[in-house]
Amino acid sequence: CNVIYGFRDFKVHSKICCITRQTDQGLQHITQLGTGNYNEKTAKLYTDLSFITTDETFGRDATEFFRNMGLENTSDNYDIMWVAPLQIKPMILAGIDAQIERKKAGEPCGLFFKTNSITDKDVIEKIVEASQAGVDVTLFVRGISCIVPGLEGYTEHVRVVSIVGRLLEHSRIYGFGPRDNMKVYLSSADLMTRNMDKRIEIAWPVLDSELREQILGYLDVSLSDTAKLRELMPDGSY
């Protein structure tokens, strides 16, 4: 058993497991990535998403991730995963920029983020820029939202909703594009400076179309809730 205690300067907040086994065809990697903790107590209270795959692209990235953990190396040398502190925020900002450009070109566009809180100044300013360009943005934020929707000239194309119920909304989902062609990512990282700049976090794409539709269907149901859903108003009330 080799225990790696992580980084001195960064909190490890990612949730990843990689099992390597020998088969008749060679080495196989079974990779699990999650939005929630490996904690038997909070697992009974939190709602999260877990992804398990034998795709070797994920396996190679997971192997590289654990190698970097042992070396205290904040590398960005990954094929498919985004790893904070170097990649997640820049890739989110680039994804928002891409939707702004699509709007300017008259193409279908849109943005969706599900997060526990949104406090990062860079991301908020970029979302405001997207709204000013006319991109519709939906933010599913259970906790703190430092962006106020519906402000003329700034956030009139931003919608912020929250669900607080018996179980804690804990999954993080990023969506870039219109509903029928949205690129979906799952992540351990909230849209907070501490998560994206000061922690080791992972975000990864949902490439399987069936899984993508399951996630979008789950979000459709959540956003149509008529009992627990609350919407943030321009005056700060819900």
How does the language model describe each region?
Residues C1-H29, G34-N37, T42, T57-G59, ...:
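PLD/PLD-like phosphodiesterase catalytic module centered on the HKD motif
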Residues K44-T47:
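Acidic/polar active-site rim loop that often engages polyanionic ligands
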Residues I52:
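Cofactor-/ligand-binding subdomain signature composed of acidic, glycine-rich
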Residues D55-D76, P90-A94:
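Short, compositionally biased "basic patch" segments
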Residues E72-M81, G106-P108:
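Gly-rich Lys/Arg/Thr-decorated short loops/hinges at beta-loop-alpha junctions or inter-strand turns
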